[in-house]
Amino acid sequence: MKIAYCIPALYYPSGMERVLTLKANYFAEVFGYDIRIILTDGKGKKPYYELHPSITLHQLDIDYDELNGMSFYKKLPKYIAKQERLKKKLNECLHQIRPDITISLLRRDINFINQMTDGSLKLGEIHFNKSNYRDLSNSRLPAFLQTIVSNYWRAQLYRQLRQLKRFIVLSHEDAREWTELDNVEVIHNPLPFFPDQISDNSHKQVIAVGRYAPQKGFDRLIS
């Protein structure tokens, strides 16, 4: 079995990158699958999490990181050009690899993953809840532009997701949110270890570690 994952980069610590690494390593080590990971950014940077030695990385070097900090109006033409470049290079890469399954982690490649002509089954895997995916509320765009862009993105996204063989979410709660789709499957995040003991709730302290952002829900721990 040959599986190709599409993700922007692996050089920084984050939940999506950690989960992908755990699953890819397990598939390679336990099942002996041929795992390929296709990247668009982070050329020359070492993966933050250790990968099984049999896993192959394919760096397309699109460099979306270059767009960080640019204004919307300056970024837009550059983004469109990079999307066209990614579409071409990804199709070439998949034809070279010839995977049985290609899995998009719903980053920039999801806009055209179904147009790839390599013949592999196409899956999508999302590591965000629906309300926070493609959320422009914190952008510097005027409110009316936020609405226009968000509605366009979501309509385009639903069209692409319907064409996937399966669309994978992390929980049954998440699955209930995607009412527009009938191809949703639930695969929970893996546990990297099992605790040696279970709390008896005698210590009334909670320790939370994570990025301080609205979707992490730290405010809900304090109320």
Predicted regions and their residues:
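Active-site proximal beta-strand in glycosyltransferases
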Residues: 3, 101-103, 116-136, 147, ...
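N-terminal strand-loop element at the rim of the active site
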Residues: 6-13, 26, 30-77, 177
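A structural motif in glycosyltransferase catalytic domains
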Residues: 20-23, 27, 206, 221-222
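Acceptor-binding helix/loop patch of EC 2.4 sugar-transfer enzymes
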Residues: 64-76, 124-152
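Membrane-proximal helix-turn-helix segments that form the acceptor-binding/catalytic region
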Residues: 88-92, 144-167
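Short N-terminal targeting/anchoring amphipathic segment
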Residues: 90-109, 121-123
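Carbohydrate-associated surface elements
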Residues: 173, 190
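Conserved donor-binding/catalytic core segment of Leloir-type glycosyltransferases
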Residues: 199-216, 222
